[in-house]
Swiss-Prot record:
SUPFAM superfamilies named among the record's database cross-references: FAD/NAD(P)-binding domain
Family the UniProt entry places it in: Belongs to the paxM FAD-dependent monooxygenase family.
Disulphide bond pairs: none
Record GO terms (molecular function): FAD binding; monooxygenase activity
Function: FAD-dependent monooxygenase; part of the gene cluster that mediates the biosynthesis of neosartoricin B, a prenylated anthracenone that probably exhibits T-cell antiproliferative activity, suggestive of a physiological role as an immunosuppressive agent. The non-reducing polyketide synthase nscA probably synthesizes and cyclizes the decaketide backbone. The hydrolase nscB then mediates the product release through hydrolysis followed by spontaneous decarboxylation. The prenyltransferase nscD catalyzes the addition of the dimethylallyl group to the aromatic C5.
EC number: 1.-.-.-
Record's signal peptide: 1-21
Leading EC class: oxidoreductase
Pathway(s) the chain acts in: Secondary metabolite biosynthesis
Name of the protein: FAD-dependent monooxygenase nscC
């Protein structure tokens, strides 16, 4: 098979960037991944992988079995778990089960995955090691498709055939080649906390409520408080919680969308006061309270979405840039599908590149980019809208949740 004349340059070692790199590498197409952070960076929280996302990845990797993915990424993999979630919604002020999906089917369709473990698993799914270069923060790109150069803040310069923008919601590449495409800040409050428990404490305090589910979703009167397993061993459990709600008005003390990174790690007094007034049920009240917060790592997350028109994507392609992941379809984390579409982006882009490189003729990469966007643009942009709508629906008033629960009971 003929190879492209120059290397594909992938900016960002997240899910979409590593998926693209792994599949190109497995097909013999040279590529380099550049990552601004250090190798020890951590994003150890868990995400939900849906069948449409992981099945495409497993197929592209040579029809690997689902069990291989589960053994590598499930938060409870070290104790023989499968990353299973019950997909139930509970009233976080009473503990009452509001929405309970039919669990009579034996097939598991959603898999919780630890993000760190997922990145490692993707990177390891091949005989040849990926070329990932850390400490490379992008400064600019220059050139056109087939001949483009990436310039980094450490003065390094790399020439390639195509730049894959896998650099996230605040994409440096997007801000340069498409300065008019800016992330849209969603009027939502979202705080994320991380903490640890011994297995004994977990089995005593959380397991009676969650069963074997890797996430315990609590919904309240316009706010949510999910508890999620990030990683579990025989002796220790790493967990996180989220507190999210819509903005109440212009004077909302917790709506701070443009916080500096250091301030985003501080616990504001308004959050402590608000959590104390929620009157939560067990197990949520044990962890989302002023005293417990003192021992948790707490982060303020700003929810941003990115929309991109087909014309925008095409113009970037003419400059040698193609987008994957959050750089062009960022969506809410809770209730979102971002990780799944990041996987699909990597699968579909790599497939498009492999097909055109193997075919005769010129303008290989221009054709690959056009082919990729022909399917990926509509899929991903619809997902952004769908996920944003779902986020607001998941933060509905308590009266609506109770109405839904009553209708479910009558339908049985």
């Amino acid at each position: 098979m003929a190879k492209p004349q120059a290397t594909v340059l992938i900016i960002g070692a997240g899910i979409s960037g590593l998926t693209t790199s792994r599949l190109l590498t497995n097909s013999g197409i040279p590529n380099i991944v550049f990552e601004a952070s250090t190798p020890d960076r951590s994003q150890g929280f868990a995400i939900s992988l849906q069948e449409f996302g992981y099945s495409a990845l497993l197929s592209a990797l040579g029809d690997l079995p689902l069990s291989s993915l589960i053994r590598g990424v499930a938060p409870d993999r070290e104790i023989g778990g499968t990353g299973w979630i019950d997909q139930a919604l509970r009233d976080n002020c009473t503990g009452e089960l509001l929405v309970a999906p039919d669990l009579t089917t034996a097939k598991q369709t959603v898999v919780r995955a630890n993000r760190n473990a997922l990145r490692r698993w993707i990177a390891d799914c091949g005989e040849e090691e990926l070329d990932v270069r850390y400490g490379h923060k992008l400064q600019s790109v220059e050139g056109t498709v087939g001949d483009i150069t990436a310039v980094f803040e450490n003065k390094a310069r790399y020439r390639g055939s195509l730049v894959v923008a896998a650099d996230g919601v605040n994409s440096t590449i997007r801000s340069q080649v498409l300065p008019g495409v800016v992330p849209e800040t969603i009027p939502l409050i979202h705080y994320h906390g991380e903490f640890q428990l011994s297995r004994t404490a977990f089995d005593e305090l959380i397991r009676p409520h969650s069963g074997h589910s890797n996430i315990l979703v609590g919904v309240g009167d316009g706010f949510n408080t999910p508890l999620s397993i990030c990683n579990m061993t025989k002796t220790q459990v790493h967990l996180d919680w989220s507190y999210s709600r819509t903005v109440t008005g212009d004077d909302d003390l917790l709506y701070r969308p443009n916080l500096p990174s250091e301030e985003a790690k501080q616990i504001p007094p308004a959050l402590v006061k608000e959590l104390a007034a929620l009157a939560l049920a067990e197990p949520w009240k044990r962890f989302l309270n002023p005293e417990s917060l003192k021992s948790h790592r707490v982060f303020h997350w700003t929810t941003r979405c990115v929309y991109m028109t087909q014309d925008d994507a095409r113009r970037a392609g003419e400059q040698g840039v193609v987008f994957v992941g959050d750089s062009w379809h960022a969506m809410p984390i809770f209730g979102g599908e971002g990780g799944n579409h990041a996987l699909l982006d990597g699968v579909e882009l790599a497939d498009a590149v492999v097909k055109v490189v193997a075919s005769p003729g010129k303008d290989h990469l221009s054709k690959a980019v056009a082919s990729y966007y022909a399917g990926a643009w509509k899929r991903s942009q619809e997902a952004v809208r769908r996920s944003t709508q779902r986020f607001f629906l998941l933060h509905r008033p308590a009266a609506e949740w109770k109405e839904i629960a009553e209708k479910k009971k009558k339908a049985v």
